[in-house]
Amino acid sequence: HRLLEINGGVSEGDTQGTMHFERNEKQPLEADVVIIDEFSMVDIYLMNALLRAIVPGTRLIIVGDVNQLPSVGPGNVLKDMIQAEFCSVVRLHRIFRQAAESQIVMNAHRINSGEEISLENASPDFMHLERKDSASVINVVVQLIMQKLPPHVDASPYDIQVLTPTRKGELGVEHLNQVLQQYMNPADAGKVEREFHGVLFREKDKVMQIKNDYQIRWTKKTSLGDVYEEGTGVFNGDTGIIREIIPVAEQVVVEFEEGKMVEYEYSQMDEMELAYAITIHKSQGSEYPAIVLPVLGGPKMLLGRNLLYLSLIHI
């Protein structure tokens, strides 16, 4: 979206008719080579816009994992292109993120092959902890996040991500966020808090942008508060920390990666939700030092092969 200089739309819910790309056949991209990563997330509308903005002679290199979830929008472009066999395809087999003997790697391959995964806890990067009920599962999740995993992976509890296939239920996003908020960012007289759309937010909460907002302004400031860089756009899946809630101004200040500060009006907080736990789908395109995946049965459609595979490859 940013490469093609989207203009006009505010969120991912807008229709295709309300937004357009500045880059097209009349004002194409000025590049000899265009490389697109995480291509499984591209739908047919975005692919069409991309091709219109590329002039003949430009090389287009597409990088993606066909085993990940397809785009939220219509189409399964990456898979269809590979199956159509009309362009050159190179399959990469060597993995650099984990060691070859990693159980993460082994189990990811087994999931793709439809085989039973190994639960032997034979390597330090993959642990399976069995519990019989949701209360016991939640207790283990809290212990892992707050005590056991941070020293094991040398990361803050805020960097460790809980992934779950569903939003509802005891092990869904909504309930897990309430529980984890109590442990990771408990109420304190020194923290301002406020409820928006039925969810309690407080200063120092971990949050996620859940809609593409191409117009919202962000700034980067020095320690003295002087702005040295600014721009627009916060996107679906971006995570940050609430630094300040200002009741007088009716604003919530969120710091995103690379020090980008965004001032949300209270009316814009429908674009935000707690992010101690997120759905597996929302995690696509991200990477974490460790993840915790609480699963206790459920509908088969929520425990599909591509969801389990996607949850493993983020580490």
Model-predicted segments: where are they?
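Residue-level preference for the first positions of well-ordered beta-strands
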Residues: 33, 59, 159-161, 206, ...
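Charged, alpha-helix-enriched surfaces in structured cytosolic catalytic cores
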Residues: 41-45, 49, 55-64, 72-76, ...
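Residue-level signature of catalytic and energy-coupling elements of molecular machines
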Residues: 37, 65, 92, 166, ...
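Conserved nucleotide-binding/hydrolysis modules and their immediate coupling elements
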Residues: 43, 181-182, 186-309
